[in-house]
């Protein structure tokens, strides 16, 4: 099952984490600070294909493999696909309703499937509900949120892969 490493603001050895990913995996470079996001993208470039979160200008500038959009910008996918047809375009989603607007995307990251420390207080979908949602999606769905080596086996085959933060950091 392909893996997606989602970076966050913590100071971690993201390059080491990216090097450990199996072939076919990607890294989503996230972060609020544009200078830090640029520095991280430059560090990771060439280690694994990169999707830049919510920053199409940076994605184009560094020659990223694509763009990751927040759920609220999912409808922009067709625009970015037309402008950069070679890009992989993904988005986050948190409900079946959100996934119904995902037709122009290559994949969606559905979250949170399990309880997660990165979004304290967010109510998990649960594996059963998440599997139902993923099974009705018009595009491939990756499970995100609290996914670990211990609970990944509880995910249904309706998922195309796993996206994670903490469980992929060395």
Go through each PLM region and give its residues:
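Nucleotide-sugar-dependent glycosyltransferase donor-binding/catalytic pocket residues
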Residues: 115, 148-149
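Short, flexible coil/turn micro-motifs enriched in small/turn-prone residues
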Residues: 116, 140-141
């Amino acid at each position: 099952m392909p893996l997606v490493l989602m970076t966050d603001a913590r100071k971690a050895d993201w390059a080491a984490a990216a090097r450990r990913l199996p072939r076919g995996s990607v890294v989503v470079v996230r972060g609020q600070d544009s200078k830090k996001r640029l520095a991280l993208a430059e560090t990771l470039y060439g280690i694994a294909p990169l999707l830049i979160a919510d920053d199409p200008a940076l994605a184009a500038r560094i020659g990223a493999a694509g763009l990751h959009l927040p759920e609220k910008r999912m409808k922009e996918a067709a625009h970015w696909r037309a402008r950069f047809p070679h890009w992989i375009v993904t988005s986050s989603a948190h409900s079946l309703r959100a996934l119904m607007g995902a037709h122009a995307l290559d994949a969606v990251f559905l979250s949170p499937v399990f309880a997660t420390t990165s979004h304290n207080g967010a109510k998990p979908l649960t594996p059963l509900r998440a599997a139902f949602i993923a099974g009705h999606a018009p595009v491939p769905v990756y499970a995100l949120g609290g996914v670990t080596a211990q609970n990944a086996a509880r995910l249904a085959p309706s998922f195309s892969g796993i996206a994670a933060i903490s469980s992929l950091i060395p």
